[in-house]
């Protein structure tokens, strides 16, 4: 079950297509946009308080882009930050599962992170913002994920840029950011790319241990949105022996439709030992890998 970068992209595309709508209609993008002088953001100004604030859109540098936000998902991280500010980011414009259309580009930007040609009017999603200065960035420039000081749009405390998260009308893409052209996908599918990529990465990490293959017994504990996507990714990779555990019958039934072989409601068992015995029963005494 060897998986390279191209096959990962195909898997994500297949999973997203099965979970959402089709591709976006092929509409020629205009090359010029009317950009307002000011725009609004949803600023988390204190715990449990979001204010709509308006700021002047700054000039875009040669290595920057201005993106008109078309939509953004709400992640559990956004909820945690809204309730308790565990990362100490306030004031902050949240939103990291977003996508939008490029309306202005600096002269030095011609391609996305994978090398695809880029122009005004293209739709993109963002990933991390490597610092470009730590040891990992300087010695392993092709491994942006290892940056020791990586930033993420939607988790950047308020600064002079102002438009730092997808919970706003516009987003400014900074120099050194990772971003990807996704013109061939509908908005709903684009908003699922980030969580789907997380799931693919998790499966890749599991595969690196040598414990997951086509005949593996896989256990997924919790089938909320991420767990359900993880189920879809594992199933797409050809694994059939999948057991899911959750306390919500509706979610368990949905998991069945997504390809789970066994479903277990943990509320039906008084303790962990009973639950473990049930898992072994449904896997023929083998347990899970």
Where is each model-derived feature located?
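Protein-protein interaction and targeting regions used for scaffolding, dimerization, and localization
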Residues: 1-35
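N-terminal Rossmann-fold NAD(P) dinucleotide-binding loop
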Residues: 227-228
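Glycine-rich beta-strand-centered segment in the early N-terminal region that forms part
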Residues: 56-72, 85-138, 183-185
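Adenosine-nucleotide cofactor-binding segment
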Residues: 220-223, 235-289
